[in-house]
Amino acid sequence: MTKKDKKEVKVQTVTTEDGETVKVFEDLQGFETFIANETEDDDFDHLHCKLNYYPPFVLHESHEDPEKISDAANSHSKKFVRHLHQHIEKHLLKDIKQAVRKPELKFHEKSKEETFDKITWHYGEETEYHGRPFKIDVQVVCTHEDAMVFVDYKTHPVGAN
């Protein structure tokens, strides 16, 4: 077993003001594994979890040391925003599609919202698994403060059966 395989999944369970319990992950691998496991357990249409992490391209540039991440890596940097958008489209969403066993998902509902403090991308798609229709909503936020990225993943059933 390699050192990477032994990596402990960093996760916290928090309770929102609405009384909902949400798992908050600190690494992409644990987040994707959780979604895949919940899909296997048929809990795919009532899921809410979050991911707060430094994207792999940021860690690569800092030689895997969060202390060495450039202060310029934030929502005010065009280069950071461009690379983050590529990471979301080519890696994060692709990995989510694989985790929910729906590689054909297209995330047709796309939007981007920019303010001085942050940039938010919204992705949504209705799909079906085991004959149960549900909607996936993914929100990705980066702020002007640092390179930390916040992902909010929610699924809910669609229509009354």
UniProtKB/Swiss-Prot annotation:
It is a peripheral membrane protein. GO terms for cellular component: cell periphery; cytoplasm; nucleus; plasma membrane. GO terms for biological process: energy reserve metabolic process. Keywords: Cell membrane, Isopeptide bond, Membrane, Ubl conjugation. There is a cross-link at K68 (Glycyl lysine isopeptide (Lys-Gly) (interchain with G-Cter in ubiquitin)). Pfam families: RGI1. It is found in: Cell membrane. Its main location: membrane. Induction: Up-regulated by a wide range of conditions, such as intracellular iron depletion, carbon source restriction, high temperature, high osmotic stress, cold stress, unfolded protein response, and high hydrostatic pressure. The promoter contains several binding sites for the stress response transcription factors MSN2, MSN4 and HSF1. Down-regulated when treated with different antifungal drugs from the azole class. Present with 8450 molecules/cell in log phase SD medium. Involved in the control of energetic metabolism and significantly contribute to cell fitness, especially under respiratory growth conditions. Belongs to the RGI1 family. This is Respiratory growth induced protein 1. It comes from Saccharomyces cerevisiae (strain ATCC 204508 / S288c).
